[in-house]
Amino acid sequence: MTDTLNRRAAMALGLASAAGAALATPALSQDAAPATVRNNVSGFQMHAWRDHFDSLGKPMLVADTFSRALHYWNAEGGDHRIFPTSVPISDDLTKRGYTEIVRKKEGPSWTPTPSQMARYPDWKPIGPGPDNPLGTHAMYLSWPAYIIHGTHDTRKIGRRSSDGCIGLYNEMIAELFQLCPVGTRVRVI
């Protein structure tokens, strides 16, 4: 009986020591191995509006595809908000540069792009609702087929998962939708 208790005590002490060592080990930094990180990563790098736009007067958005975050500044530059996003799945699908919001739609319909139809000929347009890939709100950019929109599939946020669009949680696109009028300046980097 004493041997059994001693073995159990030794095992408990060993497990406690291992747990303590694990807690004392520092976590790996996000930049330790960026090539191996595949899921839900966002560095939320800080940006200043002056680094992207010459003047104030209209709200501004910077979609940072590297850190997978969308930065918003109001027309005065004082209100800065950061939203986690999904970004295009590849650099080939990522259009970078300056554009603006040209149209907004609450409860948007989705239509596959020509390139999506070539890859997936059975895909059909989807009206508003829980199956719609654009989520609850969409802000259309001056570039054809590029949209800042919501998503019902929250697993996509923080990942490279779109065919060119910038996706946000539905709650966050609803907030941004109210802040950004047509004419809001947008830069995708």
Swiss-Prot record:
Pfam families recorded: YkuD
Keyword annotations of the record: Cell shape, Cell wall biogenesis/degradation, Glycosyltransferase, Hydrolase, Peptidoglycan synthesis, Signal, Transferase
One GO term describing the cellular component: extracellular region
Pathway listed: Cell wall biogenesis; peptidoglycan biosynthesis
Record domain L,D-TPase catalytic: where: 59-189
Residues in the signal sequence: 1-35
Entry GO MF terms: glycosyltransferase activity; peptidoglycan L,D-transpeptidase activity
Origin superkingdom: Bacteria
PANTHER family: L,D-TRANSPEPTIDASE, L,D-TRANSPEPTIDASE ERFK_SRFK-RELATED
Annotated family: Belongs to the YkuD family.
Protein's name according to its UniProt entry: Putative L,D-transpeptidase in ATP synthase subunits region ORF 5
